[in-house]
């Protein structure tokens, strides 16, 4: 087994924070647009999942897939029980299995199946697989008839297709285990530039005749993930990671990504909006 990359722990922490922020719109009384980052956070987490997936032993498919189930579904079942007891949620077993963890869990369980067979038979052709997936996603998005206000990162199944690219990207970089040198100024500017370009292109979703152009967001989003990964593997971030309290917090948040994703929307309340922005700190805590 290859050595664990601690940058992934840091990256998962970032992913958890931005995904959580994207669901906090009721906590921004006058600045709802700041409740953003969901697409970036999802891309980061799919990247992290792909990065670590091939580092462990694979073995027979049924045993390997059971290990994936055992890592995810105990938390899903636990939250289903707590949600029923504390918040009055009503879930039957079919609903829990199919959507109890939200779209993300259902999606990643499907990705696991695809990635197992890709690892088994196409490991040497990951770049080709990545290219084919991108071409298929782009072709499908261009050809399908979508509403004029269609959001490719919003509700619906289309995002299940294109987020697979980020999991493949993570798998490729996880296997390579290449050392990246982070340049604070230039790589920092590239990261900021990718984020700015992503949101600029993402704005096309609100312009009916240019709605299809939002698929170009994949390019800066891939860049955002890459430079975030470089940042998290920088010497500075590794020093921060090894600080006792900060490092413990990063490990805790990164290790509880799934749990945070499941419970967050049930805990958010607008009853403290009068003390904005301190209500955000309370909710994050």
Model-derived regions: residue spans:
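Membrane-interface helix-boundary motifs at transmembrane edges
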Residues: 2-5, 57-67, 117-129, 152, ...
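Membrane-anchoring hydrophobic segments
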Residues: 4-7, 14, 26, 30-35, ...
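Transmembrane alpha-helical segments and their boundary/interface "anchor" motifs
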Residues: 12-15, 39-46, 53-115, 186-195, ...
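Alpha-helical transmembrane segments of polytopic integral membrane proteins
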Residues: 17, 47-50, 111, 170, ...
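Aromatic-anchored segments of alpha-helical transmembrane domains
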Residues: 17-25, 79-88, 132-147, 191-207, ...
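Interfacial loop-to-helix transition and helix-capping segments at the boundaries
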Residues: 30-42, 93-107, 144-169, 201-228, ...
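Hydrophobic alpha-helical segments with transmembrane-like composition
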Residues: 45-46, 52-55, 83-178
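Alpha-helical transmembrane segments and terminal signal-anchor/GPI-anchor hydrophobic tails
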Residues: 161-164, 178-284
């Amino acid at each position: 087994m290859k050595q664990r990359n601690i940058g992934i722990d840091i990256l998962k922490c970032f992913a958890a924070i931005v995904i959580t922020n994207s669901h906090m719109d009721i906590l921004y009384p006058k600045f709802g647009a700041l409740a953003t980052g969901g697409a970036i956070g999802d891309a980061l987490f799919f990247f992290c999942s792909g990065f670590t997936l091939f580092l462990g032993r694979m073995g027979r498919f049924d045993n390997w897939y059971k290990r994936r189930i055992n890592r995810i579904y105990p938390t899903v079942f636990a939250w289903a029980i707590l949600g029923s007891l504390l918040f009055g949620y009503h879930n039957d077993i079919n609903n829990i299995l199919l959507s109890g963890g939200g779209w993300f869990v259902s999606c990643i369980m499907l990705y696991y199946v695809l990635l197992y067979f890709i690892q088994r038979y196409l490991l040497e052709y990951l770049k080709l697989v990545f290219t084919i997936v991108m071409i298929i996603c782009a072709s499908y998005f261009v050809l399908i008839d979508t509403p004029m206000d269609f959001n490719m990162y919003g509700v619906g199944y289309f995002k299940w297709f294109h987020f697979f690219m980020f999991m493949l990207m993570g798998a490729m970089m996880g296997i390579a285990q290449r050392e990246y040198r982070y340049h604070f100024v230039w790589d920092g500017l590239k990261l900021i530039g990718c984020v700015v370009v992503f949101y600029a292109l993402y704005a096309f979703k609100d312009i009916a005749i240019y709605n299809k152009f939002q698929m170009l967001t994949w390019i800066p989003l891939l860049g955002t993930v890459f430079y975030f990964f470089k940042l998290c593997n920088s010497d500075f971030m590794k020093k921060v990671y090894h600080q006792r309290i900060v490092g413990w917090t990063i490990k805790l948040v990164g290790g509880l990504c799934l749990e945070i994703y499941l419970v967050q929307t049930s805990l958010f309340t607008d009853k403290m909006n009068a003390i904005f922005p301190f209500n955000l700190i309370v909710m994050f805590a």
